[in-house]
UniProtKB/Swiss-Prot annotation:
CC cofactor: Mg(2+)
GO biological process terms on file: glycolytic process
A GO-annotated cellular component: cell surface
Residues at which Mg(2+) binds: D242, E287, D314
HAMAP family: Enolase
Chain residues that bind (2R)-2-phosphoglycerate: Q163, K339, R368, S369, K390
Keywords, alphabetical: Cytoplasm, Glycolysis, Lyase, Magnesium, Metal-binding, Secreted, Virulence
Cofactor note: Binds a second Mg(2+) ion via substrate during catalysis.
The name this protein goes by in its record: Enolase
Residues annotated as the enzyme's active site: E205 (proton donor), K339 (proton acceptor)
Length: 430
């Protein structure tokens, strides 16, 4: 047993040039852990609260000095003296100290920074890797990467409505080869876009953000890139989409306004469109296909294609066990996106993954659009044997940091490492 002796936070920058919280935890035995907190662009209304200063004269109101102060002046006093390995106790104490259902008093960004830094310090204390500390002897499955190589929606300044178009190298024999395949497809996509005279600037998550005529043209362009890279779409590489539909849902009319295409659709018309897309293209996963409050639409989508396609709830579930439990009971979706900062503690994150698995739902460990060099989610993915990770294109240091950590973990596991490819989607018809 080793006691936490110091907790210290500071304001640093994320990948979008916005402030975020960094926390360091020290123990009496000299162990140390550091964590940086990510931030989202498209956020669910039920997410835990990210505390920002609101001072327009400083970082356009996005400073996090208040959250930093909450760590240094309030949370530290509560956490110092805890056994560093008492993760549940540490997280429970911070939740109680905050006292709100959405961590709005102290800020989820303050609480999460301490939660993750404590876990890292505990791993350091025990002389093990973070994935070993969190997963014990059974953490061994390297995730299939869900690589966002073409961006639209809130992640790019273009006329593509769907937020993310991704590739999943399901035919790779291991993670190392999956990463290589993804990188080669990304380079092939750049060549395809250049050949069409399109912009090859990148979005927040490292993918390209060209002005395309339609969402379907984005799919066609990626299909071409996969072939040009020498791979077979549908066999070696499958497609995934994050529609982030809440971003183009009009709550007054109850319809989806895809302004890039100049199309307005009802919930049922959206479901029909997805049916057409999965018939035409090798799409294995659709995230937030409908608005986070359109549960009737989600139910219809699940009934129509939920046995063939992974239907991921991001804004729908916001890594929250209460929301997930309701979704499971109502038969909504079949997968949950896991974002540590949506819920605000490591303990609650692991609880959500466990609940999903028990219900036969898959869990996709995810980054945010505003990221840092922190690679904790890579360790969480392996520790929990989640089987999937969504952390952007294999470009930009903030994204590559996670991929490189997974390469290290795969090396460290050696012959014990597993990569499940298509079998990752254990709840779909083969």
């Amino acid at each position: 047993m080793s006691i936490i002796t110091e907790v210290y936070a500071r304001e640093v920058l994320d990948s979008r040039g916005n402030p975020t919280v960094e926390v360091e935890v020290y123990t009496e035995a000299g162990a140390f852990g550091r964590a940086l907190v990510p931030s989202g662009a498209s956020t669910g209304e039920y997410e835990a609260v990210e505390l920002r200063d609101g001072d327009k004269a400083r970082y356009l109101g996005k400073g996090v000095l208040k959250a930093v102060e909450n760590v240094n002046d309030i949370i530290a006093d509560k956490i110092i003296g805890f056994d560093v390995t008492d993760q549940i106790g540490i997280d429970k104490a911070m939740i109680e100290l905050d006292g709100t259902p959405n961590k709005g008093k102290l800020g989820a960004n303050a609480i999460l920074g301490v939660s993750l830094a404590a876990a890292r310090a505990a791993a350091d204390e025990l002389g093990v890797h973070l994935y070993e500390y969190l997963g014990g002897v059974n953490g061994k499955v390297l995730p299939v990467p869900m690589m966002n190589i073409l961006n639209g929606g809130e992640h790019a300044d273009n006329n593509v409505d769907v937020q993310e178009f991704m590739v999943m190298p399901v035919g790779a024999p291991n993670f190392k080869e999956a990463l290589r395949m993804g990188a080669e497809i990304l380079h092939a996509l750049k060549a395809v876009l250049k050949g069409k005279g399109l912009n090859t600037g990148v979005g927040d998550e490292g993918g390209f953000a060209p002005n395309l005529k339609s969402n379907e043209e984005a799919l066609e362009t990626i299909m071409q890139a996969i072939k040009d890279a020498g791979y077979k779409p549908g066999e070696e590489v499958k497609l995934a989409m994050d529609a982030a539909s809440s971003e183009f849902y009009n709550r007054e009319t109850g319809k989806y306004e895809l302004k890039g295409e100049g199309v307005t659709r009802t919930s049922e018309e959206m479901v029909t469109w997805y049916e057409e897309m999965i018939t035409k293209y090798p799409i294995i996963s659709i995230e937030d296909g409908l608005d986070e409050n359109d549960w009737d639409g989600f139910k219809l989508l699940t009934e129509r294609i939920g046995d063939r396609v992974q239907l991921v709830g991001d804004d729908l579930f916001v890594t929250n066990t209460t929301k997930l439990k309701e979704g499971i009971e109502k038969g909504i979706a079949n997968s949950i996106l896991i974002k540590v900062n949506q819920i605000g503690t490591l303990t609650e994150t692991l609880d959500a993954i466990e609940m999903a698995k028990r219900a036969g739902y898959t869990a996709v460990i995810s980054h945010r659009s505003g990221e840092t060099e922190d690679s904790t989610i890579a360790d969480i993915a392996v520790a929990t044997n989640a089987g999937q990770i969504k952390t952007g294109a294999p470009t930009r240091t903030d994204r590559v940091a996670k991929y490189n950590q997974l390469l290290r973990i795969e090396d460290n596991l050696a012959d014990l490492a597993e990569y499940h490819g298509n079998d990752t989607f254990y709840n779909l018809k083969k």
